[in-house]
Amino acid sequence: AFGTKNRHLTVSLVRDVLDETNREHLPGKQYWHQESAYITLVMGEELERSFYHQLCHIIDTRVMGTTSIYDDWADLNPDGIDYTNRYHFSQTETIDAWFSGDSRIFIDPYSMSFPREDRARILEYAMMPGNSEMFASETMQKKLATLCDGIRQAFDLDDTTTYLWEQYLITPEK
């Protein structure tokens, strides 16, 4: 698995990525070939965010293969709030309050699709500057803390270093 000895991550920058299934242009994609991970990214404004998003999918493979911390990820959402388990859904399935302020549950409607997309959006925004408001709610703090704990467990990061993806964690006063 990625993160172990002799495993590689290759990143390719391209002009376009076309999803052959639904003929949509994508900002990037990730995949595995044998024991190596690959990320393909479209050059442009969203390059950095897309890199973090696709990297999270690679990291997820390691976290889910070595820990059980994500097993109850859906339980981090308030009661009655479920993932749609599909990428295309109508706006009537969302409530604006779920995406803002102290009641934020998701980064955006896309993050409602699957738990893995929720985690990828969280890492994507956690790695970028100026996003503290995205993580102000109790639900988003729980999700971010679980994501960070998963990465620490999977990659044996038990030191006291605060990593970039942890910059928006609010830690209680001791």
Report each predicted region and the residues it spans.
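Zn2+-dependent metallopeptidase catalytic core
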Residues: 1-8
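Active-site-flanking segments in enzyme catalytic domains
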Residues: 10-174
